[in-house]
């Protein structure tokens, strides 16, 4: 097999915590990563530290505050910034666009289906990231669709003519397997399915509905995350 998208060869992003980077073999890899821990064990603090690392590396990122409990003063102290707008941006007084563009997009959406479909929609608009063993290089692979070619030009990427002849697709060499987008959900247990309503007054039924919806929505997203 001349082509592989093995995550072991890919880029790993620092968590900004040396010990955790060592435990995770260099940092966060592409794909699905879950931080488990008891209540008040530091999961949200880790998420805030991760935001700082993402912002510094200019990786398009999204913070999904499903709990709706982000303490902006605490977040600034952890991240070492003076104002949370340094991350989330500041909207224009007119309400149109941003006065200060966001480095990280913020939403407090907590409906499970909406969150995963939002993530899926963004990932589907990104080209596949592929490591080729025959060349020993990373590539972003674009189709010949108009939207793909426009994105390729906007990013200033040039395709490999030889690979285009072989495959009929645009293979654009990139320095490493750095992931193209990151999503921080704080937290998964705070997401609720749209089916859980007043009629689901029994806790056991609500848990079952959440589990079923999660299993359905997460599969396509996990696959896309590893490819992007």
Stretches found by the model and what they are:
Residues 151-180:
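Intrinsically disordered, low-complexity acidic Ser/Thr-rich regulatory segments
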Residues 181-219:
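Conserved P-loop NTPase nucleotide-binding/switch module
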Residues 59-60, 178-182, 227-228:
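Loop/turn-to-beta-strand initiation segments
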């Amino acid at each position: 097999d001349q082509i592989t998208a093995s995550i072991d060869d890919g880029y790993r992003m620092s968590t900004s915590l040396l010990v955790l980077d060592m435990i995770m073999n260099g940092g966060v890899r592409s794909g699905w990563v879950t931080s488990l821990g008891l209540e008040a064990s530091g999961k949200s603090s880790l998420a805030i530290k991760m935001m700082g690392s993402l912002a510094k590396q200019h990786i398009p990122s999204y913070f999904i505050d499903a709990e709706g409990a982000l303490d902006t003063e605490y977040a600034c102290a952890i991240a070492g910034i003076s104002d949370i707008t340094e991350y989330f941006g500041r909207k224009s007084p007119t309400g149109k666009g941003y006065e200060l563009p966001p480095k990280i997009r913020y939403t407090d959406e907590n409906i499970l289906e909406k969150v995963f479909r939002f993530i899926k929609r963004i990932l589907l608009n990104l080209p596949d990231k592929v490591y080729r063993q025959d060349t020993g290089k990373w590539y972003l692979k674009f189709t010949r669709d108009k939207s793909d070619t426009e994105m390729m030009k906007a990013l200033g990427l040039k395709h490999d003519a030889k690979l285009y002849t072989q495959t009929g697709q645009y293979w654009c060499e990139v320095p490493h397997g750095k992931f193209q987008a990151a999503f921080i959900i704080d937290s998964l247990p705070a997401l609720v399915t749209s089916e859980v309503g007043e009629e689901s007054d029994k806790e056991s039924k609500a848990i079952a509905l959440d589990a079923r919806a999660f299993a359905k929505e997460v599969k396509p997203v996990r696959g896309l995350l590893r490819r992007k």
